[in-house]
C-alpha cells in the first residue's frame, strides 16, 4: 500500500490521511511478529518459502524448482533423474533483457522446446514444454552439484557469467 506523500494533505500519503476505523480496529486487536520462511543457507526464492510454510524439511527434500515444475506439468520423475527448470529468456547482445522471453506464449514456446528436444534430446536428456517461459529439463544420472542463477534475479546483466556452472568435475557432463 505504498504511495507518495501529497503536499496538499500535509505531506501525508492517501492512506495516512484516510479515515480507516476498521483497519485501525484490526491493528489494535491483532498481533504481529516475524515469520522466517527461508531456512538458513537457502536461496530466498518463492519455491523455498512456499515449501517451508507448508512444513517441508528443506534440508532433506529440497531439490530446486525442477521437481515442482515436473509435478505441475504431469512429468513423473524416476529414481536417478535430475529435473531442472528450463527458462526461455530474452537476450539482447550480451545482456539478459528479461527472464520471460518477452512474455512468450505457451504455443510459441512449445515450438522452441520441441526444437531443443529434437536437436539435443536423447535417451539421457529430455525437454518438456511447460507454461509460457517455464519449462523442464530432465537428465538421467545428472549431477546436482551445479551453480544455477535464477534469471528473474539478474535482469539487465551480462548473461554469459550467469550460465549454469558445475561445482565439481563430475557435474561437467
Model-derived regions: residue spans:
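Glycine-rich, mobile lid/loop segments that gate access to catalytic sites or pores
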Residues: 89, 100-173
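Active-site nucleophile/metal-coordination loop of metallo-enzymes that catalyze phosphate/sulfate
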Residues: 2-125, 132
Amino acid at each position: 500500500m505504498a504511495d507518495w506523500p501529497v503536499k496538499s494533505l500535509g505531506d501525508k500519503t492517501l492512506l495516512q490521511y484516510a479515515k480507516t476505523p476498521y483497519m485501525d480496529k484490526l491493528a489494535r486487536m491483532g498481533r504481529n511478529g516475524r515469520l522466517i520462511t527461508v531456512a538458513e543457507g537457502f536461496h530466498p526464492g518463492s519455491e523455498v518459502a512456499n515449501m517451508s510454510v507448508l512444513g517441508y524439511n528443506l534440508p532433506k527434500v529440497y531439490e530446486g524448482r525442477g521437481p515442482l515444475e515436473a509435478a505441475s506439468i504431469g512429468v513423473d520423475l524416476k529414481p536417478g533423474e535430475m529435473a531442472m527448470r528450463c527458462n526461455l529468456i530474452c537476450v539482447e547482445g550480451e545482456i539478459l533483457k528479461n527472464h520471460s522471453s518477452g512474455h512468450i506464449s505457451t504455443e510459441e514456446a512449445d515450438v522452441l522446446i520441441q526444437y531443443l528436444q529434437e536437436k539435443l534430446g536423447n535417451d539421457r536428456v529430455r525437454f518438456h514444454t511447460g507454461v509460457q517461459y517455464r519449462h523442464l529439463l530432465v537428465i538421467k544420472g545428472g549431477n546436482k552439484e551445479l551453480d544455477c542463477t535464477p534469471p528473474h534475479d539478474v535482469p539487465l546483466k551480462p548473461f554469459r557469467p550467469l550460465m549454469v556452472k558445475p561445482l565439481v568435475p563430475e557435474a561437467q557432463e
